[in-house]
Structures are given as C-alpha cells and as structure tokens.
Amino acid sequence: MRTVSLIIVHCSANKAGSALRTEDIDRYHRSLGWKCCGYHYVIPTDGTIEAGYPEELVGTHCKHHNSHSIGICYIGGLDDGGTTPKDTRTEAQKATLRKLIEQLHQRYPKALIVGHHDLNPQKACPCFHVTAEYIDCLLYTSPSPRDMRR
C-alpha cells in the first residue's frame, strides 16, 4: 500500500453548471497521452461521486505530488462566461466533497488537505481556500497527543 500524505482538491476549470462527467475527463486525459482520468474521484454538479483512477494507484493530477496523493476534482471552477476562476460548487457538490474528504482523512489521518493552488501558486484551482474550509476535518480526525506518542 502506498503512503498518502496529501488529499488534493481540484476543479475541472469549466463553466458553472457544466454537465461534464468522469468519462469526459477520461477522454480528455487520454488525448494528452495519459492512461485514463488522472483524478481518483470526480464530483459532478449533481453531487454524485464518480470513481476515476483507482485509489491504490498513483493518479495524474498534480505534478511532483502524484505518488503520495489522492486527487479529487469537482466539475466547475469558472464563471458563467468561462473565463474567470470562481468557486462554482453547488450545494450538492459542497456536501459530497465534505463527506468524501472526511472519509479519506479517516483512511489517511496524516494526510494534509490542500487545494491544487497550495502546491502550485500559479494555479487558481480549485478556486476556494481548501485548508480553511476543511480545517475542522483535520481537527476532528487528527490523532490525540496520546496516540502520537506511540
């Protein structure tokens, strides 16, 4: 089993309300010469979770960090005109993303929860401050000081 030290949140950089699905991302990533959809999970606007790359395998979503991370992508991230980065998550996406991050952090309690832009400041992705939004997930699932002494 590989060591996962990062849970990285991305956006697909599509217009608000885009009907994009995992198979669309898969097709695009294959056109770039990748094996398949580089994200482990994709969250369309309806809030469902779609599986991308198997979690136990290394994805292709964040240069220099793929080997030790899980990649989650929500569909959206651009304004209605498709030109300006914007947090376009639907309420369903927000709820699903929170649940998925909580589940992943329980499986990988030492993993940091970050946005793509936290690792590459030239990116706007995912268009919101991931660490600030999910700090309570880290606090809730972090080991207690007693557990850390073991």
Features from the language model and the residues they span:
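Single conserved hydrophobic/aromatic residue that forms the stacking wall/gate
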Residues: 140-150
